[in-house]
Amino acid sequence: MSSRTIQARIPAGVSDGQRIRLRGKGAPGERGGPAGDLYVRVHVTPHPIFGRSGDNLTVSVPVTFAEAALGAEIKVPSLRGVPVSVRIPAGTPSGRTFRARGKGARRKDGTNGDLLVTVNVQVPQNLNGAARHALESFRDATAGEDPREDLLRRARQT
């Protein structure tokens, strides 16, 4: 068994664990026959920011309570380094996923998958006086609304 280094071009769109065949780069054939094929299993190192779901990239993005409640247009990172604009509609809950078409991983056919952006509403840890007063006013203005009311009602019925 011998050892040698082979250069191989890894095509765009390859996923973790996929096998690539390198024709004629394997062991020499018997009795002077042509060399066989070499199979390489690809390991894709996880990205610190982006995940992958098939041809789609995934990213989790923090948003403020105000952005989620009132709506906003936010900039999110993309793999190409150019931020992508995503519109967050008013009333967006934490965990909702938005799709930026064509901003994901490159497919084998040369097109791109999508960028799936999941928003996570961040709760402020330290409030200044004005922010605290604004939230207390909001709490007072929505005092009659209970987000758990339906859950409690359904639990009593079971």
Residue ranges of model-derived segments:
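Charged, often glycine-enriched C-terminal and inter-domain segments
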Residues: 1-158
